[in-house]
Amino acid sequence: MTVFNPVWRVKIQGVAYTTYTLSNLTITSGRNNIYQQAQAGYCNLELLNLTQAIVNININDSVSIELQDSTATYVPIFGGTVVDFGVEIITAGSVGINQVLKITALGALSRLPKALTDGVLSQDFDGDQIYHVLQDLLLNNWGEVPAALQWANYDPTETWANAQNVGLGEIDRPGNYELAARSSDRVDIYSLVAALATSGLGYIYEDSQGRISYADSTHRSVYLATYGYTEL
């Protein structure tokens, strides 16, 4: 059997911690069974800091866990934000100290239970209704952009679509099932989106870059027919 020696890369707020040693890593994401929608992904990791370098990690910093594939290209497998951070000194001497950085990160779905919406929806297909709910939270419009922010400040490779996208992934639209209209009734966004996804026989999930996505009822069969395999 071929020995699997994974090459990892941890990026926090866009900074790759290549001089640190990844000592422990746990990632949990998806759903527990087919009868419920996915919960927020969870990542717990420890980094050994043997370099005496100053650590600059804050709550809500972005976290990306990447794994090198057979072409030496790093592929993201988890994306989220820091919700807990601790530093533990494991050894100390006359020259310096060695630290363990303990980081807990949550995926994008953790944002939805904290956001409320009136949930007014017109009769439409499942994917379009879910997109309508999520885009108001995860896509900024011109009026929501700070006045001091100018297009010239963006990296040339960025477009408006990704520069102000704060977590919306692939949404299968329009979907396969037409859902009833919904009148104003205040609810948290997770409960609403989960109910819409269940009604459409689809599922919400976090992609490897930490974005919230929706797969409709035929997503896997269409993907299989197109690419010859499906992602679990």
What are these model-predicted stretches?
Residues 76-87:
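Short beta-strand-centered aromatic/proline hotspots
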